[in-house]
Amino acid sequence: MSTTVRPDEVSSILRKQLANFESEADVYDVGTVLQVGDGIARVYGLTKVAAGELLEFPNNVMGMALNLEEDNVGAVLFGESTMVKEGDTVKRSGILASIPVGEAMLGRVINPLGEPIDGKGPIDAKLRLPLERRAPGVIYRKSVHEPLQTGLKAIDAMIPVGRGQRELIIGDRQTGKTAVALDTIINQKGKGVFCIYVAIGLKGSTIAQVVSTLEKYDALSYTTVIAATASDPAPLQFIAPFAGATLGEYFRDTGRHALVIYDDLSKQAVSYRQVSLLLRRPPGREAYPGDVFYLHSRLLERAAKITDDVEVAKKMNDLPDALKPLVKGGGSLTALPIIETQAGDVSAYIPTNVISITDGQIFLESNLFNSGQRPAINVGISVSRVGGAAQIKAMKKIAGTLRLDLAQFRELEAFSKFGSDLDKTTKAQLDRGARLVEILKQGQYVPMPVEKQVAIIFVGTQGLLDSVDLKFIRKCEEEFLAMLEMKHADILSGIAEKGTLEADVASKLKDIATKFIATFKEKNKA
């Protein structure tokens, strides 16, 4: 019995088979690793890759394209270079280096790629923003006019920092630079300022200590720590500050206030130099690449006070689409970069670069630190280019005489070492200066509210402490402020609310201080 095959049956079977056949083809742009080592990989074949784009290497190692050359791409690796070998396939990710942002990041310790490293589980952040972004143009900015209180008397009185300012903290190692930054973070409690602490090239133990300090003083709830430790690859250390700026910009552009601390940019410059030399970029002064100034300027220019006009703010240059619906005006991003000097040499390459970019510097000196003056701020070299605009009126009023008195004291102190016979006026100026220096001393992690600062500096500049023995000044200050808080809280709250020191309040404060000091001297007779 023969079976006949009908052509129409065959064609209908084929049609059914073809209808059920689905071809799934994923198209990837791939390249091949030509050479790898020291955290750098040279990749052949990625002809359409963008500068700053993330690349996927085998074994879950991520990289970033930095050098786009004629025949290959120079990429930096964010993982161990031993995990990547010659001939490996590299995939383009199609996305530029970015980081998750949002309130979910607060209270967490993350690496510069936004991955949590504190063991508290994954972060539920809906939004991702690119690490690199152009700074807001002039039209979208507003001049700095609100104070960002650090809680340190010497800074808030003489080197005030405003919201949206860039103020450099510079000094040798072990002079208390990080302590100043941490005090500033602790002082933002309840002030609606979100803080980002970027640790670049620090020891893991140091970062753990910083985190435990922030936890101890209830400051971690409004702070994010971005950590690139000394053992992390150089590329991670170099991108860490940009991650901090991006996170701060999210708060700034949504109409809130943020403070970002870069600790420290000297180590970032060193890691950038390492990456650049490995990528065979031509070296310049001190072997840094020619664009090391641009590295820091494009980072620090992102700190700004944004205009109050929402419509103008929404047109901000380089604003990511995902962020546009959330934009509000009036936000600010304040930057406190830290630079470590060698033997007090402020005129080295990186320190001079960053000094010229920032709106002032707080210079910490090891001699002052070792002599017991802490914070060890050299008031002569330190400056804030925003000045009185970043102070409340009461502080502005009394701080002018403070700076002058201290300058005269330093000058006379140098001369007094040569001769012992001093006239009455000179001796009085020296005595007052010594007491003012004593007033400006402050313990670590005890930031002082601005109204208390105003009260004690007013008492000092009025000469009311001149008759108090120098060794009792700190004790007198503590007891006086405690007494004010207990019996005359209205004066302190008045200064805090109005921001001014009216003539009647000033005379009342003077009377209270005079009576208190008289009884204090009686009580503490030697």
Curated annotation (Swiss-Prot):
Binding site for ATP: G171, D172, R173, Q174, T175, G176, K177, T178
Feature type site, description Required for activity: S382
Catalytic activities: ATP + H2O + 4 H(+)(in) = ADP + phosphate + 5 H(+)(out)
Superkingdom: Bacteria
Keywords: ATP synthesis, ATP-binding, Cell inner membrane, Cell membrane, CF(1), Hydrogen ion transport, Ion transport, Membrane, Nucleotide-binding, Translocase, Transport
Membrane topology: Peripheral membrane protein
Entry EC number(s): 7.1.2.2
GO cellular component, one term: plasma membrane
GO terms for MF: ADP binding; ATP binding; proton-transporting ATP synthase activity, rotational mechanism
InterPro entries xref list: ATP_synth_asu-like_sf (IPR023366), ATP_synth_asu_C (IPR000793), ATP_synth_asu_C_sf (IPR038376), ATP_synth_F1_a_nt-bd_dom (IPR033732), ATP_synth_F1_asu (IPR005294), ATPase_a/bsu_AS (IPR020003), ATPase_F1/V1/A1_a/bsu_N (IPR004100), ATPase_F1/V1/A1_a/bsu_N_sf (IPR036121)
Subcellular location(s) of the protein: Cell inner membrane
Gene3D superfamilies per record: 2.40.30.20, ATP synthase alpha/beta chain, C-terminal domain, P-loop containing nucleotide triphosphate hydrolases
Functional summary from the UniProt entry: Produces ATP from ADP in the presence of a proton gradient across the membrane. The alpha chain is a regulatory subunit.
UniProt-listed HAMAP family: ATP_synth_alpha_bact
Subunit structure: F-type ATPases have 2 components, CF(1) - the catalytic core - and CF(0) - the membrane proton channel. CF(1) has five subunits: alpha(3), beta(3), gamma(1), delta(1), epsilon(1). CF(0) has four main subunits: a(1), b(1), b'(1) and c(9-12).
Name of the protein: ATP synthase subunit alpha
The species this protein was found in: Chlorobium chlorochromatii (strain CaD3)
Underlying gene: atpA
